[in-house]
């Protein structure tokens, strides 16, 4: 930590010439173009150096010592510093994160400092932005257990929901995210000073909500799930969020939970979410397959491509549409036969079953 003196140009006492390109490019000096004046960005603030994961200083954060605004001020984004891709305290916390088996994300630098002073050195802070998808990627590389601690007021809950939304596309099976909300009158700094390390960690481990629980709690808030309208509203709001999740197991379980909440079969839910097409049973047809056929070069080329696609992805059979004017012979008849066989069952057969079915036929 350090201190930026009060005054407009304290850096001029240290750096000459003042200003210079390095000071302006790294954001330490601001140019007022209207008055053509230069002045220091950080004035009368406690200073926190921000390091990258290699320990190099890439920016600064400053906290006021009085009631001035903004309370926290960060270096602007520069070629070296991107707030959405860096976390305060990560370099210093890396060993403690490994030892604890978890990483804690808070909102302010002073929270990180206070927690470390009271024996919780595995905390990091976002840099004046909401937690981004890039932050989530970084956090998941550090630990399988990621805890977020937010103030219990409306602003804290809004920040928590933004963090959850940005986390959804990055989620991986085997990684767990948890959300702890402190009493409205506390932030992590004041809470640990009032209650100590043991009570803070007890709350962190036993009172935090896993992402899956917080997700449904937040989406269901204010909805009457005893009514069809409430259930449909939940479906509408949950669907685009669930679509962002690429973690197979977690995504499946969350959709299963949605089916339970709205009281429908998971298979029907999959259709509602647009993930499956209802099976279409088609009566088997028999097409003539003469050994000598009139050739239709363009259609035959397309038919051959579609046959290869069906053998690789049988579920695509529902998309096969042959115009009425096409003569069903040769490759087009083969395509029609294969598509009808695939659609005749409740689930698409694999390509081995397709080969076996047509083994001794002209198809």
Regions found by a protein language model. Name each.
Residues 7-142, 146, 159-160:
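Phosphate-handling DNA/RNA-contact segment within nucleic-acid enzymes
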Residues 52-53, 94-103, 130-146, 150-363:
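A charged alpha-helical hairpin associated with nucleic-acid processing machineries
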């Amino acid at each position: 930590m350090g201190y930026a003196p009060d005054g407009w140009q304290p850096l001029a006492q240290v750096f000459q010439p003042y200003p210079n390109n390095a000071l302006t490019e790294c954001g330490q000096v601001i140019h007022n173009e209207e008055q053509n004046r230069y002045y220091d960005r950080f004035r009368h603030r406690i200073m926190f150096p921000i390091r990258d994961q290699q320990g190099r200083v890439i920016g600064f954060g400053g906290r006021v010592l009085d009631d001035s605004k903004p309370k926290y001020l960060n270096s602007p984004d520069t070629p070296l510093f991107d707030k959405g891709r860096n976390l305060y305290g990560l370099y210093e916390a890396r060993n403690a994160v490994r030892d604890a088996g978890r990483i804690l994300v808070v909102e302010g630098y002073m929270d990180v400092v206070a927690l470390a002073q009271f024996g919780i050195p595995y905390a990091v802070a976002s840099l004046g932005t909401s937690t981004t998808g890039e932050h989530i990627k970084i956090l998941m590389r550090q630990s399988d257990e990621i805890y977020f601690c937010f103030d219990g007021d409306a602003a804290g809950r809004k920040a928590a929901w933004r963090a959850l939304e940005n986390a959804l596309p990055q989620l991986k099976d085997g990684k767990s995210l948890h959300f702890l909300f402190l009493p409205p009158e506390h932030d992590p700094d004041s809470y640990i000073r009032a209650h100590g390390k043991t009570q803070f960690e007890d709350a962190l481990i036993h009172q935090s909500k896993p992402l899956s629980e917080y997700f449904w709690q937040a989406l269901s808030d204010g909805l009457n799930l005893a009514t069809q309208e409430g259930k449909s509203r939940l479906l509408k709001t949950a669907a685009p969020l669930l679509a962002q999740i690429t973690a197979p197991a977690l995504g499946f379980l969350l959709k299963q939970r949605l089916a339970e909440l709205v009281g429908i079969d998971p298979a029907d839910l999959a259709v509602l979410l647009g993930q499956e097409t209802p099976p279409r049973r088609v009566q088997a047809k028999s097409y003539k397959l003469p050994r000598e056929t009139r050739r239709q070069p363009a259609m035959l080329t397309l038919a051959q491509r579609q046959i290869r696609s069906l053998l690789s992805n049988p579920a695509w059979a529902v998309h096969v549409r042959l115009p009425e004017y096409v003569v069903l012979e040769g490759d087009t008849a083969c395509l029609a036969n294969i598509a009808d066989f695939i659609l005749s069952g409740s689930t698409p057969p694999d390509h081995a079953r397709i080969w076996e079915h047509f083994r001794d036929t002209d198809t």
